[in-house]
Amino acid sequence: MQNIVIGLDKANQKEFKIARNFFSRLPQRHEILWNDGPNLKKLNKQLAEQNLAPQEMGKGRNVWYCMGYILSLGDTEAIALHDCDILTYNKNLLARLVYPVANPRFNFDFCKGYYPRVSDNKVRGRVARLLVTPLLRALEKTIGFKEYISFIDSFRYPLAGEFSFRRRVLKDIRIPFDWGLEIGVLSEMYRNYAGNRLCQVDIADNYDHKHQDISLSDMSKGLSKMSIDIIKAVIRKLASQGETFSMSIFRSLKATYYREALDFVQIYKKDAIMNDYEIDVHEEETAVELFAQNIMHAGKIFLDSPMESPNIPTWSRVDTAIPSFLNNLKKAIKEDNCLLYTSPSPRDRG
């Protein structure tokens, strides 16, 4: 492993220094993208002047800038991306994730990770289990068979934040700036690559991370916002393929989804009983009710904002518009990290 790139959001200068100290123990070359620092803010403003900047802060924006920095280095051919809140992390996860694209005897350009979502003897992964899968099945019943829907449904865990790819993928991939990132990446793989260039791999026997609140009272937070962003990502992709949507279709989709999701709640209840896991049916059905409501919210946002462009421009386009940008990005990040390799004292390490 040659480079480690860490994207850091919502951090002031003190928090950035804490992050630098924390990651200083890594023996590999590593840089932190301080997205809220003056250097990267200045570069983002330059992109905004050309209508090329991500419209909002978010996971997709963070990942996009990390991709740009990796491109600017020019010395990396296989790249793996994973979340930083994994509680069950070990080196085997990373090795299994990157191996399919790093092995020169394979011809894969993209690899998606998957894993069981059980922790503390509870069934996890509510958004994937209770939103994505029943939503895809409901869409097929509502608008008919679509190859794209079948493609997304073929992935064991479509919302996994762990994937790897060859360097050539980075220049022309268009990703959303919000929580639709994982679906957006799969959509780009569907559009740009043949099926035999894509794979998925089991990367962990057990996986757990920081859990988000469902946020029943605030659609702008937690799993509620995540669900809206994911629904919008799927709808926009289908619309880009010529599918027509209206409020009446969204009402039918909501009703169909609700029935599908309740059936899945019963399936997971039986799975949990058989495997001696805990599952709260009330919490499960509360999530389903929220996701059903958010289908209508996402549909209204989609219909009310037909010109909204959630995808960030490709790095190829940025490079064409501002040829010096990637080099300036590299310089800015190096400047922010200029003290990163200065070994902190034992006192600094805590």
Provide a role label for each language-model segment.
Residues 22-73:
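Active-site-proximal specificity loops/subdomain of glycosyltransferases
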Residues 76-85:
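Short beta-strand-to-loop acidic/aromatic patch adjacent to the donor-nucleotide binding site
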Residues 122-228:
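Conserved catalytic loops of nucleotide-sugar-dependent glycosyltransferases that act on lipid-linked
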Residues 109-126:
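Short beta-strand-to-loop element that shapes/binds the nucleotide-sugar donor at the catalytic cleft/hinge
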Residues 91-112:
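Conserved donor-nucleotide/metal-binding helix-loop-beta segment in metal-dependent transferases, i.e.
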Residues 341-348:
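Conserved small/polar residues in nucleotide/adenosyl-binding loops
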Residues 8-18, 37-39:
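A conserved acidic beta->alpha catalytic loop
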Residues 179, 183-340:
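C-terminal catalytic/acceptor-binding lobe
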